[in-house]
């Protein structure tokens, strides 16, 4: 499968994996290694440099790109502060912007997300903003320096799939930076659907971490993402209004009847 580019970094795996909700760090590590992801996202509060056994970084493969998120930020100012702290702690320049002031549905605040993205992009961060799919917001994020745009498929942790499919389709058509579908993808088939639409990648956490067998589920998502991308490149066949037989319905059975 061909690669894609984020912030000057070439990636082969189109599956990004979140690290929350796993029963243990060991299980998380097995899932990450088993699916071959190159980018993992994590909350900064789980980085504990003073206690090695409690430090999530000890369980993430060293060749994996860290994508710290600004989970807990309620406005742009808090997101910016978390991103700067992450860099100071040695977690790199990549950051996933999450600005959520709504505590019921956990929907991102698009306006505050744009503000944070603009500031951090100017400071040299590779910014991947999580956002409610809206074309004008996506264009603004692109214009202020977002390295990719991460529209939600459905609310975080719901596993409801691509409820915003048509809005995401518009972003795929109109936005030049990579579109990475994030949040709500609950099944490998839903990940494949996102890839068939033309998304560059998907980010999955809850559906893997809370599965009965997270390691197998992570592998299933890897294969689904690969299949979806292959289908996109192959260009799926158009729908027909009426039935069309794949083999002739007449011919040799009636030869010689005339």
From Swiss-Prot:
EC primary class: transferase
Metabolic or biological pathway: Cofactor biosynthesis; thiamine diphosphate biosynthesis
A Pfam family of this chain: ThiG
Cited CDD domains: ThiG
Residues at the active site: 96
GO molecular function, one term: thiazole synthase activity
Statement: the UniProt record of this protein carries the keyword ATP-binding: no
Residues that, per the record, bind 1-deoxy-D-xylulose 5-phosphate: 157, 183-184, 205-206
Catalytic activity: [ThiS sulfur-carrier protein]-C-terminal-Gly-aminoethanethioate + 2-iminoacetate + 1-deoxy-D-xylulose 5-phosphate = [ThiS sulfur-carrier protein]-C-terminal Gly-Gly + 2-[(2R,5Z)-2-carboxy-4-methylthiazol-5(2H)-ylidene]ethyl phosphate + 2 H2O + H(+)
Keywords: Cytoplasm, Schiff base, Thiamine biosynthesis, Transferase
An individual GO BP term: thiamine diphosphate biosynthetic process
InterPro entries: Aldolase_TIM (IPR013785), Thiazole_synthase_ThiG (IPR033983), ThiG (IPR008867)
Compartment(s) where it occurs, according to its Swiss-Prot or TrEMBL record: Cytoplasm
Binding partners and assembly: Homotetramer. Forms heterodimers with either ThiH or ThiS.
Function of the protein: Catalyzes the rearrangement of 1-deoxy-D-xylulose 5-phosphate (DXP) to produce the thiazole phosphate moiety of thiamine. Sulfur is provided by the thiocarboxylate moiety of the carrier protein ThiS. In vitro, sulfur can be provided by H(2)S.
Protein name: Thiazole synthase
Source species of the chain: Alkaliphilus metalliredigens (strain QYMF)
Gene from which this protein is expressed: thiG
């Amino acid at each position: 499968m061909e690669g894609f580019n984020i912030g000057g970094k070439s990636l082969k795996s189109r599956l990004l994996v979140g690290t929350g909700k796993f029963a243990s760090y060991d299980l998380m590590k097995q899932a990450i290694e088993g699916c071959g992801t190159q980018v993992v996202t994590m909350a900064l509060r789980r980085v504990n440099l003073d206690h090695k056994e409690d430090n999530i970084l000890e369980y993430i493969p060293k060749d994996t790109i860290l994508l710290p998120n600004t989970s807990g930020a309620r406005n742009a100012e808090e997101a910016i502060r978390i991103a700067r702290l992450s860099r100071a702690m040695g977690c790199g320049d990549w950051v996933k912007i999450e600005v959520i002031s709504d505590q019921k549905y956990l929907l991102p605040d698009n306006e505050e997300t744009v503000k944070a993205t603009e500031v951090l992009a100017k400071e040299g961060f590779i910014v991947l903003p999580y956002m409610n799919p809206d074309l004008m917001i996506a264009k603004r994020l692109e214009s202020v320096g977002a390295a990719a745009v991460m529209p939600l498929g459905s609310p975080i942790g719901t596993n409801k799939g691509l409820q915003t499919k048509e809005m995401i389709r518009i972003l795929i058509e109109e936005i030049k930076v990579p579109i990475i579908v994030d949040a709500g993808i609950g099944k490998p088939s839903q990940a494949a659907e996102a890839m068939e639409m033309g998304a560059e990648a998907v980010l999955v956490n809850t559906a893997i971490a809370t599965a009965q067998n997270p390691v197998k589920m992570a592998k299933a998502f890897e294969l689904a993402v690969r299949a979806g991308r292959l289908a996109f490149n192959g260009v799926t066949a158009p729908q027909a209004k009426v039935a069309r037989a794949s083999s002739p319905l007449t011919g040799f059975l009636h030869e010689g009847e005339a």
